[in-house]
Amino acid sequence: MAFPPIILASQSPRRKEILQLSGLSFSTVSIETPEHLDPAESIESNVRRIAEEKAKAAIQSFQNDTRDPVLLGADTVVAIDGRILGKPANAAEALEMLLQLQGRTHEVHTGFALLQSAHLYSECATTEVTLNKMTEEEILHYINTAAPFDKAGSYGIQDPVMACFVSSITGCYYNVMGLPLSRVWMALQKLRS
């Protein structure tokens, strides 16, 4: 049994790259949704809700699609000491975030949602990442060369400079990049059965 058409509701080049690893054919749609974090909700609930909102916003464009596509939405945040580190607005924010992560373990939470017709499934994957200490000079070099402004927590684990400072990871590597592919794959398998 083949998969239904998959539509990735994301502008992230990393999510597209990760989903390509599945070997599945898919298309992408660009959507704009507010990524409002509700302090009354847990981090996990927030990223699941935002992923669901992205999938629901995207399905509006495909209501008359007779192929019955699966919309995939996702949202990723970094958290340390219960505080959420989103995407930095500028180099000063990126520096502040990266200084907080030095020599410490933090969590990367990605919520993803699959929406097909009226069926909605979502979950959250969490990965723990520990970074070695970086000097301020190394951090500034990273910020100036990697442009981490579209990345939660101000870094990409796959970036050449940052890869030198990741001392351990517990959980899914692809989750840290923005999409827990093995969990998405298992959820897609359930949808088609």
Swiss-Prot record:
InterPro entries with a match to the protein in the record: ITPase-like_fam, Maf-like
A Gene Ontology BP annotation from the UniProt entry: nucleotide metabolic process
Main location (coarse class): cytoplasm
Keywords: Cytoplasm, Hydrolase, Nucleotide metabolism
Molecular function as annotated in GO: dTTP diphosphatase activity; UTP diphosphatase activity
Top-level taxon of the source organism: Bacteria
Record localization: Cytoplasm
GO cellular component entries: cytoplasm
Reaction it catalyzes: dTTP + H2O = dTMP + diphosphate + H(+); UTP + H2O = UMP + diphosphate + H(+)
UniProt enzyme class: hydrolase
EC number, UniProt record: 3.6.1.9
Annotated positions for site Important for substrate specificity: 14, 76, 158
Gene3D superfamilies: 3.90.950.10
Cofactor(s), by name: a divalent metal cation
Active site: 75
Record PANTHER family: BIFUNCTIONAL DTTP/UTP PYROPHOSPHATASE/METHYLTRANSFERASE PROTEIN-RELATED (PTHR43213), BIFUNCTIONAL DTTP_UTP PYROPHOSPHATASE_METHYLTRANSFERASE PROTEIN-RELATED (PTHR43213:SF5)
Functional description taken from the UniProt entry: Nucleoside triphosphate pyrophosphatase that hydrolyzes dTTP and UTP. May have a dual role in cell division arrest and in preventing the incorporation of modified nucleotides into cellular nucleic acids.
Family: Belongs to the Maf family. YhdE subfamily.
Protein name: dTTP/UTP pyrophosphatase
